């Protein structure tokens, strides 16, 4: 597979895409990582079709601005085809999906060939023990630029496992944290297990004020740090091989960050996702310009779920060729049908929109959409269309068009026998949480859940833990739950239960002496 740098040369870019069935084209980007400019967006064609693989960062020895160095080579006669002549360099993709997509479409040999061509840091350091690569890995440029974003860190830590066909999983994690006015405490999250019992979920239990939610907030703050050289006495012990942190918290009093949109120094904003009753909403300021103000609203679970269901569809379309991909819509249907019966989940679309524009084809579809009134507890009935988002029609639906006409404030509607299904408030919130997690989750994510008993009654709380186990297993991910409830603890092995207790000597974290 050919890899070619074109930079700003749009004419050559178009010609390469038109001429080659299998090609990766590297484009120009001026993104600055602590004075290093190493980032390249890509366009990838495989077997004549567009495939989304994400960007890549390339560090050249003794150079801070990679595109300027490559532009000079092109001016001196280089045709832009990799490998770069007469240069020592290493690269790291923005995420593991870069090579997973190539593997899924063309096979592992093709992915390894591209890794050699781009001198992938993980492949060269951990499989080939390449001395030139190891020297570059010890530089400031690699540490501050190629290992700045969490997706790139994960790609470096675990990329070699993909090339060696080894299982990529999250191991035990040690985290140091501090309660105000107290010494540092340490918790070991036991995610790796030699026993047959799954260790995908760890639970913290203890009274209010003992430090459980404080720990979750400190995990988020540490995860969102960008500069690896900032000294800290708290945080993860080493760089965790995580892809993403997702927070689920439906307390009206919590103050987790709702997103990272205000962080202009961050390129990958999906590395952290939050779902709860808080979010950004446009409001008019004194100057009459719209500003994104963080507000509290029970609309957010509904709007997030509608958007997340389309995200599940989009991910299944983009990443379906990856060998280890667990299809999100199939997972959603399997998990939720164990909680209540339904035929399909649907989104609500404008009643006056051109319905044909939502579909690539309707030829093989039964009931591509339904029409009827939308029951909205907060407003008048509207005449709308329900478009099922289901695993049997992934390739027939157009995500971008659906997104433009989406009535997201009406949430996700479940259809049974051709009619909207009425759910209790608990069932609705349960379904929204499942869909939100699936819409956001990447492989090897850490899900943080704060006090699920606040928003789920005991029967649904048990179903929630079992649902969580199923999703985590499908995506190689883990969860940490803070709770007061013994219901959740009963579903978890004893060595994954952390009992928080305030003593005269400070905070004590213990494991139950017997299976819970």
Give the ranges of each region predicted by the language model.
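A structural signal for short, well-ordered beta-strand segments and their strand-loop junctions
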Residues: 246-249, 344-350, 448, 480-481, ...
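Short acidic (Asp/Glu) and glycine-rich catalytic loops that position anionic groups and cofactors
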Residues: 245, 313-314, 502-506
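A broad structural signal for short, well-ordered beta-strand segments within beta-sheet-rich domains
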Residues: 170-172, 242, 476
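ABC ATPase nucleotide-binding domain signature region
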Residues: 60-123, 128, 226-308
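Switch/communication elements of ASCE P-loop NTPase nucleotide-binding domains
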Residues: 177-236, 403-516
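Extended helical coiled-coil dimerization/tether regions that scaffold
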Residues: 128-195, 280-425, 435-442
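Long, basic/Gly/Ser/Thr-rich N-terminal segments
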Residues: 1-167
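A generic secondary-structure signal for well-formed alpha-helical elements
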Residues: 223-227, 252-253, 340-344, 472
């Amino acid at each position: 597979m050919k890899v070619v740098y074109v930079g700003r040369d749009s004419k050559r870019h178009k010609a390469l895409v038109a001429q080659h069935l299998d090609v990766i084209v590297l484009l120009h980007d001026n993104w600055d990582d602590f004075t290093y400019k190493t980032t390249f967006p890509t366009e990838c064609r495989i077997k004549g079709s567009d495939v989304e693989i994400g960007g890549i960062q390339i560090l050249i020895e003794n150079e801070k601005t990679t595109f300027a160095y490559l532009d000079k080579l092109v001016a001196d006669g280089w045709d832009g085809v990799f490998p770069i002549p007469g240069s020592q360099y290493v690269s790291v993709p923005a995420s593991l999906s870069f090579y997973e997509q190539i593997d899924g479409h063309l096979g592992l040999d093709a992915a390894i060939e591209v890794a050699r061509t781009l001198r992938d840091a993980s492949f060269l350091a951990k499989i080939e023990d390449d001395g030139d690569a190891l020297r570059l890995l010890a530089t400031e440029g690699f540490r501050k630029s190629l290992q700045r974003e969490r997706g790139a860190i994960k790609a470096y830590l675990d990329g070699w496992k993909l090339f060696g066909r080894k299982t990529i999983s999250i191991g035990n994690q040690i985290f140091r944290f501090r309660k105000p006015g107290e010494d540092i405490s340490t918790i070991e999250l036991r995610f790796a297990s030699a026993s047959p019992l799954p260790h995908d979920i760890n639970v913290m239990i203890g009274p209010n004020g003992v430090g459980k939610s404080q720990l979750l907030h400190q995990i988020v703050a540490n995860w969102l740090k960008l500069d690896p050289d900032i000294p800290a006495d708290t945080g993860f012990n080493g760089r965790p091989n995580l892809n993403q942190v997702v927070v689920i918290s439906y307390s009206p009093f919590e103050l987790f960050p709702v997103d990272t949109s205000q962080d202009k120094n961050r390129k990958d904003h999906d590395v952290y996702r939050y779902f709860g009753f808080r979010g950004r909403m446009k409001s008019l300021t004194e100057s009459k310009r719209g500003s994104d103000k963080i507000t509290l609203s029970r609309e957010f679970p509904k709007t997030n779920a509608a958007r997340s269901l389309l995200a599940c569809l989009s991910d299944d379309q983009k990443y379906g060729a990856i060998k280890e991909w667990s299809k999100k819509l199939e997972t959603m249907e399997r998990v939720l049908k164990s909680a209540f019966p339904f035929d399909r989940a649907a989104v609500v679309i404008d009643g006056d929109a051109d319905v044909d524009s939502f579909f690539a084809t309707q030829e093989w579809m039964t009931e591509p959409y339904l029409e009827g009134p939308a029951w909205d507890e907060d407003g008048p009935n509207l005449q709308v269309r329900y478009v099922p988002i289901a695993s049997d029609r992934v390739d027939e639906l157009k995500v971008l068009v659906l997104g433009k006409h989406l009535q997201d404030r009406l949430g996700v509607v479940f259809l049974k026998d051709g009619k909207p299904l009425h759910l209790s408030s608990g069932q609705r919130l349960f379904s929204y949480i499942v869909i939100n997690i699936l819409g956001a989750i990447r492989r090897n994510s850490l899900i943080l859940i704060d006090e699920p008993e606040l928003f789920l009654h005991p029967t649904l709380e048990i179903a929630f833990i079992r649902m969580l186990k199923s999703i985590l297993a499908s995506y190689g991910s883990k969860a940490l739950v803070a709770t007061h409830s013994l219901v959740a603890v009963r579903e978890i092995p004893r060595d994954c239960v952390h009992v928080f207790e305030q003593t005269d000597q400070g905070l004590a974290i213990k494991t139950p002496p017997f299976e819970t």
